[in-house]
Amino acid sequence: MAAPGPALCLFDVDGTLTAPRQKITKEMDDFLQKLRQKIKIGVVGGSDFEKVQEQLGNDVVEKYDYVFPENGLVAYKDGKLLCRQNIQSHLGEALIQDLINYCLSYIAKIKLPKKRGTFIEFRNGMLNVSPIGRSCSQEERIEFYELDKKENIRQKFVADLRKEFAGKGLTFSIGGQISFDVFPDGWDKRYCLRHVENDGYKTIYFFGDKTMPGGNDHEIFTDPRTMGYSVTAPEDTRRICELLFS
């Protein structure tokens, strides 16, 4: 049963509202719009705004009270852009280039069944690094994800980067199926909470699938300002919401 008083539901996107990198189903979309009649809803994802639109619809800022791409470094409230932060002014060009060069050099040494293109994607608030390359097909994505579960390719890459860039104020966070994010310390999904913590909510619920240590939902999931729920799929998210808000 939900706690009394004004509340907000914040949802991760991949694995929580949609299958990884897939569009939201009509059933889930309809369910969330019904839920919105009872409670404010928002989304927070690591992906950029265009990818959030691809998955949740071009009208995403009209369908959710809050939309936080890139962990909230880009923020929309009530359909309007609130703010946009950028990584280069915070970290400086020298560190960004060192990081990009090191990642490309590391990727060049990994042998995988397949490699495609877009190994590093530069976003407003982070770098997204993918050993297989973001332009892989859905089948290639699943193949890499299964291999990564056995061989911990991303985990080893991140461990190496943490050692190489220790003391540089960087966080490395694994999310989704094929990549991990690199951003300044404190720019994880908790960043979005600064946009909502003064809006009068008694409870902020968070739903995410990568809630384990090292996962990109972990920090916001364990933050004392949220009530965190770990989910395994969109169906699981819906089930928990129905229990809480029926």
Curated annotation (Swiss-Prot):
Changing F119L: In CDG1A; partial loss of activity. InterPro entries: HAD-like_sf, HAD-SF_hydro_IIB, HAD_sf, PMM, PMM_cap. GO terms for cellular component: cilium; cytosol; microtubule cytoskeleton; neuronal cell body; nucleoplasm. Keywords: Acetylation, Congenital disorder of glycosylation, Cytoplasm, Disease variant, Isomerase, Magnesium, Metal-binding. Pfam families: PMM. Its main location: cytoplasm. It is an enzyme of class 5 (isomerase). PANTHER family: PHOSPHOMANNOMUTASE, PHOSPHOMANNOMUTASE 2. Involved in the synthesis of the GDP-mannose and dolichol-phosphate-mannose required for a number of critical mannosyl transfer reactions. Belongs to the eukaryotic PMM family. This is Phosphomannomutase 2. It comes from Homo sapiens (Human).
